Regions:
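Basic, low-complexity intrinsically disordered segments
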Residues: 1-160
């Protein structure tokens, strides 16, 4: 078994073949922390901006939104909604995101966890599948963390 090397890193051949290597590299590029940092609390729901999802999926925001509009019946209001002008301004102020002049004239769309799951039926590339799996794992992890905190708070209340 040969080990290929370059000046910056070593690559060990994958016994499962080149496709498996490709899948793993996409998942590795998208860290859980990077996804977690893109999840916002909007209208009381954990959600992600269309532009952040588009970057993760490797498509333009316009193409992502076009695919959604072609399948709009799959995205009810609790799966996807458009930010109001006030919400956009609030995000710009709070996070320095959505900087003026860098985005289109349209207000951003936001996808809840269910909306992100539904995107997998609209965006069908191999990358989209891997990205969706990674995002779903992060949402599950966040639920587990929240559940653990609730349990700890309950136990603390019992001790008092």
């Amino acid at each position: 078994m040969k080990i290929k090397s370059s000046s910056s890193h070593f690559a060990i051949p994958n016994p499962r073949g080149p496709m498996e290597r490709k899948k793993r590299s996409i998942t590795q590029l998208i860290s859980q922390e990077a996804i977690t940092n893109k999840i916002l609390l909007l209208r009381g729901k954990k959600a992600m901006l269309d532009r952040d999802l588009a970057k993760l999926y490797g498509v333009t925001t316009g193409n992502l939104n076009k695919a959604v509009k072609r399948n709009i019946e799959r995205f009810p209001e609790d799966f996807m909604f458009q930010l109001t002008k006030d919400e956009e301004e609030s995000l710009r102020f709070q996070f320095g995101s959505l900087k003026r002049g860098q985005h289109t004239k349209y207000l951003p769309c936001v996808f809840t966890e269910q909306g992100v799951a539904m995107l997998s039926s609209v965006l069908r590339s191999k990358r989209a599948i891997q990205v969706n799996i990674a995002i779903m794992r992060v949402f599950v992890r966040l639920k587990e963390i929240i559940s653990t905190h609730k349990e700890l708070a309950y136990k603390l209340n019992e001790l008092e």
